[in-house]
């Protein structure tokens, strides 16, 4: 199965208009489903969601949850809890771990763990992101 997503044009403070690779993903937890446009980030180890998206999915910090800290560009630590849910990309549903950020100021990222091993992902000349299984 092949799925294609157009790059999204956005403003950059430094570069002006830029095209960024995105995909439409449905996050599923219990009976809750949320459709989001996420950045496809081959540099991200794990899928990252902001606090509000996790709350909409019904996430809570449980007694067995461990608050970790992850870092990206700039080495600024972000408190997260690893959660499991289902992701639907096109017609394919996968079990995935996500880093639920305990702060709001993070982008939605589709990271490598549990996702990239299932698809061939190709970035086509700043036009499309193609997922093929």
Language-model features: locations:
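Pepsin/retropepsin-fold aspartyl endopeptidases
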Residues: 1-133
């Amino acid at each position: 199965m092949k799925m294609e997503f157009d790059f999204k044009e956005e403003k950059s403070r430094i570069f002006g208009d830029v095209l960024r690779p995105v995909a439409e993903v449905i996050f599923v937890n219990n009976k809750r489903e949320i459709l989001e446009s996420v950045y496809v980030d081959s540099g991200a180890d794990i899928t990252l969601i902001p606090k509000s998206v996790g709350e909409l999915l019904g996430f809570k910090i449980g007694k067995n949850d461990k608050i970790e800290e992850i870092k990206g560009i700039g080495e600024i630590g972000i408190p997260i809890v690893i959660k499991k849910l289902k992701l639907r990309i096109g017609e394919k549903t996968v079990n995935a771990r996500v880093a639920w950020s305990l702060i709001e100021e993070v982008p939605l990222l589709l990271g490598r763990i549990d996702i990239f091993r299932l698809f061939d992902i190709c970035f086509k000349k700043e036009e499309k992101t193609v997922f093929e299984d």
